[in-house]
Amino acid sequence: LLDQQVGDAMQILKEKNLLQNTLVIFISEQGTQFAGAKWTNWSAGVKSAMVASWPGVIKPGTETSAIVQYEDLLPTFIDVAGGKVPDVIDGKSLVDVFQGKTKTHHKYAYHVHNNVPEGPAYPIRSISDGRYRLIWNLTPKETYVEKHIEKAEWYLSWKAQDTDQAHKIMNRYKNRPEFELYDIKKDPFEMNNLADVKKYSKKKAELTMELQKWMKQQNDTGADKDRPRAPKNKQKKAANV
C-alpha cells in the first residue's frame, strides 16, 4: 500500500509535467514497536528514514551523514519556494545539503519523550552529536511504564523467562540510571553505558551542558514540565485544606 501511494503521487506529478521541477521528500515515523525502540530515546527510537528527490539538484544515489531533524522541513520548503524563512521558526533549510555544498547541518540533535499518563512521570531528554548519544532520565527512581509494550505478547514471554539475560534486558528497559552515554558508532545497539567511565567524562560534560542549554532555550524546566497537573477543582480543594 505504501509503495502504491508513493508511486501514485509520483505518477501524478509526472502526468502534470511537474516532476522535474518538484522537491519530493519522504520521511518515516521513528521507531518500531519493540522494547528499546519506539517510545524511547535510544537510537532505534528516535532515528527515522528520509529520502528526497529533486531532479537537477540532488544527484541520484547520494547519501549524507548530516544531522537533520523534522523541524528542518518547513524552512526547507519555504526556501525552495523562494520565500524568506522567519527567524522564529526552528530548524534550518536543507537546500545546501541537497545541493551537496555541505556534509554537515546541525552540530547536535535533540530528543524529548515522556510517558504521561501511562504510569509514573518519566520525562527523558537526549542529545547526539552523531557519534555519541547522551540520555538524561529525569526521574530515574521511578519505574518506566509504556502501555503499548506491556500489552505485547513478546513482553509477557520475556517477563516469564527465568534466564539471567532476559531479566537483564527487562530490568534495563524498566529501571534506568539518570544518565546514559553511548558510542553509537562502536555500540549501535547502545548496550554499553559509558556515563560513569572516567575516559568519557569530558564528552558527558559537553553533551550535558549543550542539552541543558537547549532545554533553557526551549523553556523546558525538566521533570516539573512533564508531571501531570491536578484538575483545577482539585487544586482549589487542596488549597483550602
Descriptions of predicted regions:
Residues 7-15, 35-88, 92-105:
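Substrate-binding rim/cap in mid-to-C-terminal beta-strand-loop elements of soluble/periplasmic
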Residues 10-13, 17, 22, 55, ...:
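A generic secondary-structure signal for well-formed alpha-helical elements
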Residues 47, 161-179, 184-241:
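Long, internal low-complexity/basic segments
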Residues 32-34, 81-180, 215, 235-237:
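C-terminal cap/loop subdomain of S1 sulfatases and analogous C-terminal strand-loop tails that border
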